[in-house]
Amino acid sequence: MIDRTVPSEPPADNGTVHTVDLRDAVTVESALSGADRVVHLGGVPDEAPLPDLLEANVLGTHHVLEAARRTGIERVLLASSNRVTGFHPAAHLTGPTEPARPDGLYGVSKVAVEALGQLYADKFGLSVICLRIGSFEARPTEPRYLATWLSPRDAVGYIKAALTAPSSTRFLTAYAVSVNSRRFWQLPDATELDYVPVDNAEAHAAEIPGDLATDPTGAQAGLYAEPEFTLKHRRP
């Protein structure tokens, strides 16, 4: 496990913790030395000033991929986001090969993350899988999550499938979302990513207050697509 701070609880199976800043290419490479798989989940997880997103998400991912190239790591799993396609309409079941329509600067940073993964797969032969992660929560707590929820159980299943995908997989992008009845995104092709999600947010619909209807003509991102969601992160 690699993090900027020491976790409050030790990792499972007596794993080793490395305290590393993703902005430091030398220490990233040192920490990854000897690994054969990398699950890269680090970065700024939501809308923020663009310089912060570029530094953590884009430059940090570049350091991970470059370390993988230099040390001979076989597979890199990159955490992308559903926010890469947040401006597609809610009524459209979106697939991973459709054009990016990011709903904010965070989504833009994840478009760049995927592009870096594609570059390192095409140019340097790394095996790279990008998972466009849904709303990762213990249970859905707001109306949009009825479409976007990713349960902990399904998250583990997707990650395991990505790590064990055939070695012939050079580059793959897939949505990591539970099998929600109202989902916006296509589930992965089982021939590419061998996992079938099992949890459905609809089982929790009665627990969520408010109007649960989704405007089919509105953006999948919902409130994240509003101008103010990005503008409030401007620096003075």
Q: For each of these PLM feature ranges, what is it?
A:
Residues 4-6, 11-24:
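Rossmann-fold cofactor-recognition segment
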Residues 20-56:
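NAD(P)H-binding glycine-rich loop region in Rossmannoid oxidoreductase-like domains
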Residues 23, 52-63, 71, 82, ...:
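Glycine-rich NAD(P)-binding loop of the Rossmann-fold in SDR/ketoreductase-type enzymes
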Residues 55, 89-128:
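Catalytic helix-loop patch of NAD(P)-dependent Rossmann-fold dehydrogenases
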Residues 63-103:
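Conserved Rossmann-fold NAD(P)-dependent oxidoreductase catalytic core, especially the SDR/UDP-sugar
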Residues 133-139, 149-171, 179:
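Alpha-helical substrate-binding/gating segment
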Residues 173-174, 179-196, 207-235:
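Conserved C-terminal active-site "lid" loop/helix of NAD(P)H-dependent oxidoreductases
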